[in-house]
């Protein structure tokens, strides 16, 4: 099992590896991550409908497990690239370029799953839940969306950090499970998950002929994804800054 200082020391090399990948490879891996998180969102939706919020929260960690174990690029986890950037292993420009490409890929993957599941009738009988979930997210006040985004990515980056401490699949799943369970249970906001939930709500409303005035591309992007993404960046970078200060900064 890797210690926290060993994980911190590994991040400069991890950062170099991530930014050295070709744009196509990065984009494809990011699309996969968006799909994995979206599929977890599908499962969590049914967990909420047929069980309760705890069941939905218990299912959702499958998304990050697929991201880490199968291998893909997730925007929220890549906020930890602040560590190699501060260590000058990569440039800020390289970090921002990675974030932009991964964000775009995550969006493509998540929207693809939203379109396929709604179009394929996966949510038959539970469209009201899909629409209500999206509408609630779109109606969040901007400060609430920002703060929930910060709290969410503190937990997500801790989940990534804890998974890196393990050397086997079982340990990685155990490490990431509880932080992800907590963020879903607490109702915090994850931009990549919302790239699924919000389009799914829009598609479901259109499929059912339901009028949902606050479910538009504008409210999705400006009302939710923008503040949640900013919050996720702040929360993720805060985790990276603390661990970099504690373990890598020269005394």
What do these predicted regions represent?
Residues 1-251:
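Alpha-helical transmembrane segments and their helix-helix packing motifs
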């Amino acid at each position: 099992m890797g210690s926290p200082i060993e994980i911190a020391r590994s991040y400069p090399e991890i950062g170099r590896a991530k930014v050295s990948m070709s744009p196509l490879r990065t984009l494809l891996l990011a699309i996969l991550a968006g799909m994995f998180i979206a599929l977890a969102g599908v499962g969590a939706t049914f967990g909420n409908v047929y069980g309760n919020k705890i069941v939905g929260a218990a299912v959702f960690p499958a998304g990050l497990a697929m991201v880490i174990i199968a291998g893909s690029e997730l925007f929220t986890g890549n906020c930890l690239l602040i560590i190699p950037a501060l260590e000058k292993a990569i440039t800020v420009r390289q970090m921002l370029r990675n974030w932009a490409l991964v964000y775009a890929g995550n969006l493509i993957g998540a929207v693809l799953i939203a379109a396929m599941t709604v179009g394929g009738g996966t949510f038959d009988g539970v469209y009201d839940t899909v629409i209500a979930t999206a509408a609630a997210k779109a109606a969040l006040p901007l400060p609430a969306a920002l703060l929930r985004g910060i709290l969410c990515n503190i937990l997500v980056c801790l989940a990534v950090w804890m998974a890196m401490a393990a050397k086997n699949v079982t340990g990685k799943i155990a490490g990431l499970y509880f932080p992800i369970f907590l963020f879903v249970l607490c109702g915090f906001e994850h931009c990549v998950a919302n790239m699924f939930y919000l389009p799914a709500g829009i598609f479901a409303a259109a499929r059912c002929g339901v009028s949902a005035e606050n479910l538009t591309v504008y409210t999705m992007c400006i009302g939710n994804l923008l503040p949640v993404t900013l919050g996720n960046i702040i929360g993720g970078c805060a985790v990276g800054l603390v661990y970099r200060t504690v373990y890598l900064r020269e005394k």
